[in-house]
Amino acid sequence: AVEKVRHVGDLVACVAAVDEATAMEALNLFEVEYEVLEPVFDPKKGLEDADEPIHWRGKYHLARTNVQKRVFQEFGDRSLVETPLASSHGKWNMAGVHHGFTEPHAVVAHWDPNGRLQLYTPQQVPHYTHRALATVLDVPMHQINVIRTFVGGGFGGKSDPFPHEMCAAILARKSGRPVRITFDREEVYWINRGRHPSHIEVKMTADEEARISGFDIDALIDGGGFASFGHVTSYYNGVLATAPYELGSFHYTGARVWTNKPASGAMRGHGAVNTRCAVEVGLDEMSEQMKVDPIDLRLANLLPPH
């Protein structure tokens, strides 16, 4: 954290020592003074103007809210939804989920005699990490090797360049010795990057021929304290909601909001699982109204082969 801590567990300082006990003793010598700000824990509150937004992006900021990203998607003929034979309207509150991978975050960094950084990390996105290291360290990319070790479980949770990787590289450069950082389970949860907690509203209609005439979806997703994969998650909640179905019309509004929690990110079925769940339940409800088999309803509305 620089100037502002975004959530409990946000990294403030890093210490290297000959062993963990010495490092912990050194950490206890730190004294940090905090000015307590009004926290934002509810993404709905994040839509409102704030005296102190969690992040401030100058001319690119959306008013004084904590909205990171808004997305609007639409196609088709909206008049098709006006006289439906069947309809469904559902509101969903989805909890956040962590990946629960077996291996915690870990990294080893050292600088060889030629001044090249060798960084070993169980990353899912080693190229992202490579670029981030070059920027943070102000070192050309050709002087950095990122070695992707065997990933002991990831499921999307190791898909960011992480601060502890930057810290290991900096501490190794300062000390002239290899540096290893291994998280305990609590520290893994503070880093998070799990599935977004979401508030989702889905309206859908079908006509007298059992054709899906429209999806109308709104998704408010809780991004936590940092962006991570949030930009694309905001899109995926819309574009992946259509699945393999041919729709008469489609309307989607989405917003990702910063809150004072560990950051949400990518997790299996990234950006699709929550809205897809809501959509499929809605299709089941419409099949009951029309007294048709739910599988037949889906088969009748599949996109044609290309």
Model region roles, listed by residue range:
Residues A1-A132, G230, Y235-S249, N260, ...:
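Extended, polar/acidic
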Residues G115-P122, E209-A219, R256-V257:
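Short, well-ordered strand-loop elements centered on a beta-strand within folded domains, enriched
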Residues A1-D10, K44-E48, E52-K59, Y128, ...:
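Short, surface-exposed loop/turn segments at secondary-structure boundaries that line and modulate
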Residues V97, I170-V188:
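FAD-binding glycine-rich core of flavoenzymes that anchor FAD
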Residues H7, S88-W92, L119-T121, Q143-R148, ...:
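General beta-strand structural signal in soluble alpha/beta enzymes
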Residues V97, T135-V139, T253-R256:
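Conserved helix-loop functional segments at active or binding sites
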Residues A106-W111, H199-E208, G214-A219, Y245, ...:
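Short beta-strand elements
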Residues V12-Y34, A106-S175, H231-T242, A266-N301:
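Alpha-helical support elements that line or immediately flank enzyme active sites
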